[in-house]
A protein has these predicted regions:
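Bacterial N-terminal signal peptides that target proteins for export
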Residues: 1-10
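Terminal, compositionally biased segments
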Residues: 5-6, 22-26
Length: 124
């Protein structure tokens, strides 16, 4: 594979992940979509924390971009906010490692636990 092919594939992957998903609107109830958007926003609002994925540490804003892209890519599998947590935002599909949120004090929590707690706050 040439460098040009790799660059083209990289650009296509970025476009795929960044593209808005028409599937969200068709298969996901509006209330569930709003819950997912709120959960993603809550991750982005973590000012004193980092998102840990496959051993690498990321700023919350990068985690937001990543979670939206992964949700977009897996939109046909996500029928609820709980599905989003379980199928998209909890662990790496490649390595099987759980995603973590690492706070400035060194404490870590699985993203699944954080998101489930946040979901409880927004559900009636």
């Amino acid at each position: 594979m040439t460098a040009g092919n790799i660059t083209t594939l990289s650009v296509l992957l970025i476009l795929l992940l960044a593209a808005p998903s028409f599937g969200h609107a068709q298969t996901l109830p509006a209330a569930e979509k709003q819950k997912i958007e709120t959960l993603i926003t809550r991750v982005g609002d973590l000012k004193d924390a980092k998102f840990v994925r496959n051993g690498s540490t990321y700023e919350p804003s990068t985690a937001v971009w990543f979670l939206r892209g992964k949700w977009n890519f897996n939109s046909s599998d996500v029928k609820s906010a709980r599905d989003f947590i379980d199928k998209v935002a909890s662990m790496s599909g490649t390595s099987g490692q759980p995603y973590l949120i690492r706070f400035n004090d060194g404490k870590e929590i699985h993203s699944r636990n954080f998101l489930l707690a946040e979901l409880k706050k927004i559900e009636p």
